[in-house]
């Protein structure tokens, strides 16, 4: 982050007060389109289409845009002329796209610098890669086994543009930047009413910035969750992009609420609270009673409706009892499972059998929703019976095989932490048989005849890749005993949800 701070050329006091002049500096555009900062779009190409301006960027275009920004009237273009009005060879929409990227980057760096300073003096938990989605589950396994209720909250989106502008006012004191931000935001809403190509939409970085600033303001309300907490934060610069938040055990904050929030002190009798937020949802785990959990629920509803002026239905907050209900989180179904243990104790000539029960977090694959996603993509029918992928029959055999193998390995990689591998093997079976049926359909043959001609070597492609990786991680004796197939493995290189999870 130190290297980004040099680009701003401001000290801490001026940094939040004078952001508008940065729109007229060429080196900021270089930073915005730098390979490192633009990594997000390439990594998430499966979700967002690359827009044209990434390929057309040049210093000449930047100079033309800055020249146009000095003349304010030239930025205001009627919406009907948005794609027809050209300025130095580019449409007005193209320049608005560049401005949206620049605005997001400038404010992101400013936010991140202040966010980093807010962690000073805090106790940071060590983690090899806290950006990984799988790093959440070991945390939940260690902590949720001690709790009985979880509050599952779907974070609402603001329905009015002024709410976003108002949220940004708390953090950006530069009036010129706020007016410019409001202008670009309203211009974009005018474009949505007209026929504009999907790839011409504003940069996803801009919308991620809007969403994260909204969530950041919401989480700042719960300062008591951060007053005396330990943080596990991301290790890279993309701290504002869907940042994983971990708040550990909260203690010694009752005095704060006696002074500031005496009316809701009854909600906070239990000082042990865990909060996790990722991908538009958050969970709050406590040891509270059902009555107090309902109070938490309506507190969330009133918070959004009264403080943030967002219509928020109570159905968006669900109370899950972990011993009875399944918690659907990040593509897994999690619940508490009682694991009985019998321990024999020998004392002199007498022996005793001691029954012990260990509570364990059980994470399973939601097989019905995964099969529904596979059926929607035409890999199988709604009952889970594999069918041929007709749209891929025009590709080469190697291309078809590589596609299926890649999908199978990605699913195995993401759901390697499942406690029941039977459902995972069923999904892999569907993909393997779908691959064979697709190849047989291409060659106008039956599945039996096609497999007889090629042998079993075709299906081994689905197994070798994952087995080779696991054989390097675990010792040979452990791998040979086949106990590996019953062990849950959490990988620390998974940064995004699997496509089948995102399908809904």
From Swiss-Prot:
GO CC annotation, single: chloroplast
Disulphide-bonded residues: none
Keywords: Chloroplast, mRNA processing, Plastid, RNA-binding, tRNA processing
One Pfam match: Intron_maturas2
Molecular functions (GO terms): RNA binding
Superkingdom classification of source: Eukaryota
TM region positions: none
Cellular localisation: Plastid, Chloroplast
InterPro entries, A to Z: Domain_X (IPR024937), Maturase_MatK (IPR002866), Maturase_MatK_N (IPR024942)
A GO biological process held by the record: tRNA processing
Described purpose of this protein according to its UniProt entry: Usually encoded in the trnK tRNA gene intron. Probably assists in splicing its own and other chloroplast group II introns.
Family membership: Belongs to the intron maturase 2 family. MatK subfamily.
PANTHER family hit by this protein: MATURASE K
Protein name: Maturase K
UniProt source species: Barbarea verna
């Amino acid at each position: 982050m130190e290297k980004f701070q040099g680009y701003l050329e401001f000290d801490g006091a001026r940094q939040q007060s004078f952001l508008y002049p940065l729109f007229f500096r060429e080196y900021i555009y270089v930073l915005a389109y730098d390979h490192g900062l633009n990594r997000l779009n390439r990594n998430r190409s499966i979700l967002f289409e690359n827009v044209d301006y990434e390929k057309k960027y040049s210093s000449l275009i930047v100079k033309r845009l800055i020249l146009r920004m000095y003349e304010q009237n030239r930025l205001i273009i009627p919406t009907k002329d948005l794609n027809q009005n050209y300025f130095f060879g580019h449409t007005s929409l193209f320049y608005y796209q560049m401005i949206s990227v620049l605005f997001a980057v400038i404010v992101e760096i400013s936010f991140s610098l202040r966010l980093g300073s807010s962690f000073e003096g805090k106790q940071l938990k060590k983690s090899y890669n806290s950006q990984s989605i799988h790093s959440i589950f070991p945390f939940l396994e260690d902590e949720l086994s001690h709790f009985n209720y979880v509050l599952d909250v779907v974070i609402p989106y603001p329905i009015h543009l002024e709410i976003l502008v108002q949220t940004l006012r708390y953090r950006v004191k530069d009036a010129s930047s706020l007016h410019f931000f409001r202008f670009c935001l309203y211009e974009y809403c005018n474009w949505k009413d007209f026929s504009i190509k999907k790839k011409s939409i504003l940069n996803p970085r801009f919308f991620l910035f809007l969403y994260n600033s909204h969530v950041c303001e919401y989480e700042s309300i719960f300062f008591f969750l951060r007053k005396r907490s330990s943080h596990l934060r991301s290790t890279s610069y993309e701290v504002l992009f869907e940042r994983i938040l971990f708040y550990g055990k909260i203690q010694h904050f009752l005095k704060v609420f006696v002074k500031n929030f005496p009316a809701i002190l009854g909600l906070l009798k239990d000082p042990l609270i865990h909060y996790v937020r990722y991908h538009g949802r958050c969970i709050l785990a406590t040891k509270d009673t059902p009555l107090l959990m309902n109070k938490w629920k309506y507190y969330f509803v009133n918070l959004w409706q009264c403080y943030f002026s967002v219509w928020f239905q109570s159905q968006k907050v669900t109370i899950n009892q972990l011993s009875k209900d399944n918690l659907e989180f990040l593509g897994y179904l999690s619940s508490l499972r009682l694991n009985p243990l019998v321990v024999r104790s020998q004392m002199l000539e007498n022996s005793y059998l001691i029954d012990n029960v260990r509570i364990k977090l059980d994470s399973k694959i939601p097989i019905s929703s995964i099969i529904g996603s596979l059926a929607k993509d035409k890999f199988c029918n709604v009952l889970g019976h594999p069918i041929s992928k007709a749209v891929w029959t025009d590709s080469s055999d190697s291309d078809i095989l590589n596609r299926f193998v890649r999908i199978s390995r990605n699913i195995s990689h993401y759901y390697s932490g499942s406690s029941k591998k039977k459902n995972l093997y069923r999904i892999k079976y569907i993909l393997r048989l779908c691959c064979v049926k697709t190849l047989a359909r291409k060659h106008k043959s039956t599945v039996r005849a096609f497999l007889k001609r090629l042998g079993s070597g075709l299906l081994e492609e689905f197994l070798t890749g994952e087995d080779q990786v696991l054989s390097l991680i675990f010792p040979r004796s452990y791998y040979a005993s086949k106990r590996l197939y019953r062990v849950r493995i959490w990988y620390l290189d998974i940064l995004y949800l699997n496509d089948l999870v995102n399908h809904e």
